[in-house]
C-alpha cells in the first residue's frame, strides 16, 4: 500500500487560473481545496480568449490562488509531499507562468516537482472521483481538444481518433459568437437550444460516412453560418425562434456525431477485455446535458459503465492536475528545474498526427 500523499496542483493553460490541494491514500482521494479564478469578463469584449491578456492575468493571480488553496485546505507548504503543475499543452504564456511559479516553490521548499499534461489531468479525473480501474475508454471533449483515448496507465494512452479541425467546444463558442450569444458559448447555445426545433435546418453530420473515430466540426460551423446569413438576407435579421432553432440544429448534429463515433470507439475498446469496462467523458463540453444523455444511452446499449465527473471538475481546474501529479509521482515520474512549458504535447506520442495537426505537429 502506497503512503498517503498530499499535492498542490497549479493550472494556467487557458483562461482559468487555478490551484488546489488533493490528498490521496491508496485508491481513495480527497479534494481538500479547489480555487478557480476565471477570466470570462476580461475576454468578453473580444469574443474569445486573447492569449496576451490571459497570460498577464495568470501572472497576477497565481500567487493569490495558491495562497487561497493552502488556506482553505488548512495546510502550509511544509505539509505537502509535492507540487504538480500543468506544463502543456496550452497557451504558452499562461503555461509558462504556472511552470515558473511551481519551479520557484519547489526550489524554495525542496518538494518534488511533477509536470503534468493538461489532457492527462482531464483523462485521469474519473480515477480521482470514482477510483476507476484501468483500462477504460475516455472521450476527452473540450474547447481545444476532442479525442477518444484508451487509458491504460497514468502515462499510457492510446488515441483511437479525434477531431481533425475544430474541437466541439471551439465550435460551440464560434456558434455563439455568430448568433450574438454570450461567452462561453457552450452553456449559451445549450440554453438557447432548449426551446428550439432541431429539425428545422438540415445541418450535416460530418464524417459519419467515413470509417473510424475521427471527427470534423468546421463544416458544421460553416453550414450554420450560411443558414444564418440566408435568414438575415431574407428577413433582415434573426428572430428569437430563428436563433433557438439554429442552436438546436447545431447541437443535435454535434450530439449525433459524438454518439456514433463513441459507438465505434467502444467496439475497438471491447478488444481490451477489461474486467470492468467503462466509458468516461471529461472536458468542458462534458457539462452539456444532451451530450451526457446521449453518451449514457450509448454506454447502456453497449453494456459498459458510464462515468462523467461533477460539472465543476469537467471544466479546467487544478484538482485534476494535483491528482494527475500524484498518479505520475507514484509511477516514478518527477521533474527538475529543466521542466519546460510546452504549447504542444500529444498524450499518445506513437499515434500518427491527425489530418489537421499542421506543420508544427499535433497539439494533443
From Swiss-Prot:
Required cofactor names: Fe(2+)
Cofactor note: Binds 1 Fe(2+) ion per subunit.
Record carries keyword Acyltransferase: yes
Catalysed transformations (reactions): L-threonylcarbamoyladenylate + adenosine(37) in tRNA = N(6)-L-threonylcarbamoyladenosine(37) in tRNA + AMP + H(+)
Single annotated GO MF: iron ion binding
Functional note: Required for the formation of a threonylcarbamoyl group on adenosine at position 37 (t(6)A37) in tRNAs that read codons beginning with adenine. Is involved in the transfer of the threonylcarbamoyl moiety of threonylcarbamoyl-AMP (TC-AMP) to the N6 group of A37, together with TsaE and TsaB. TsaD likely plays a direct catalytic role in this reaction.
Protein name, as recorded: tRNA N6-adenosine threonylcarbamoyltransferase
Organism, scientific name: Cereibacter sphaeroides (strain KD131 / KCTC 12085)
Record gene name: tsaD
Amino acid at each position: 500500500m502506497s503512503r498517503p500523499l498530499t499535492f498542490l496542483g497549479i493550472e494556467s493553460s487557458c483562461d482559468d487560473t487555478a490551484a488546489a490541494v488533493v490528498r490521496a491514500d491508496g485508491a481513495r482521494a480527497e479534494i481538500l481545496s479547489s480555487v478557480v479564478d476565471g477570466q470570462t469578463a476580461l475576454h468578453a469584449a473580444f469574443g474569445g480568449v486573447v492569449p496576451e491578456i490571459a497570460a498577464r492575468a495568470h501572472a497576477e493571480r497565481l500567487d493569490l490562488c495558491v495562497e487561497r488553496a493552502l488556506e482553505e485546505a488548512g495546510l502550509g507548504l511544509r505539509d505537502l509531499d509535492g507540487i504538480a503543475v500543468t506544463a502543456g499543452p496550452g497557451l504558452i504564456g499562461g503555461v509558462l507562468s504556472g511552470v515558473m511559479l511551481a519551479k520557484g516553490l519547489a526550489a524554495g521548499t525542496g518538494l518534488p516537482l511533477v509536470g503534468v499534461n493538461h489532457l492527462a489531468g482531464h483523462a485521469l479525473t474519473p480515477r480521482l472521483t470514482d477510483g476507476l480501474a484501468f483500462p477504460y475508454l475516455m472521450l476527452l471533449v473540450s474547447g481545444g481538444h476532442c479525442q477518444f483515448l484508451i487509458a491504460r496507465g497514468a502515462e499510457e494512452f492510446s488515441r483511437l481518433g479525434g477531431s481533425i479541425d475544430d474541437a466541439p467546444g471551439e465550435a460551440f463558442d464560434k456558434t455563439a459568437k455568430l448568433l450574438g450569444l454570450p461567452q462561453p458559448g457552450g452553456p449559451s447555445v445549450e440554453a438557447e437550444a432548449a426551446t428550439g426545433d432541431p429539425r428545422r435546418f438540415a445541418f450535416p453530420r460530418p464524417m459519419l460516412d467515413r470509417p473510424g473515430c475521427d471527427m470534423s466540426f468546421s463544416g458544421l460551423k460553416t453550414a450554420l453560418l450560411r443558414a444564418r446569413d440566408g435568414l438575415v438576407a431574407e428577413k433582415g435579421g434573426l428572430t428569437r425562434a430563428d436563433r433557438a432553432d439554429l442552436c438546436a440544429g447545431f447541437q443535435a448534429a454535434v450530439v449525433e456525431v459524438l454518439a456514433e463515433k463513441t459507438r465505434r470507439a467502444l467496439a475497438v475498446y471491447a478488444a481490451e477485455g477489461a474486467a470492468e469496462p467503462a466509458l468516461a467523458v471529461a472536458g468542458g463540453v462534458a457539462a452539456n446535458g444532451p451530450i451526457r444523455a446521449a453518451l449514457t444511452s450509448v454506454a447502456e446499449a453497449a453494456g459498459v459503465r458510464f462515468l462523467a465527473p461533477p460539472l465543476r471538475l469537467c471544466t479546467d481546474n487544478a484538482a485534476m492536475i494535483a491528482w494527475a501529479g500524484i498518479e505520475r509521482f507514484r509511477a516514478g515520474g518527477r521533474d527538475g528545474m529543466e521542466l519546460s512549458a510546452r504549447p504542444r504535447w500529444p498524450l499518445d506520442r506513437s499515434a500518427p498526427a491527425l489530418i489537421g495537426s499542421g506543420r508544427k505537429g499535433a497539439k494533443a
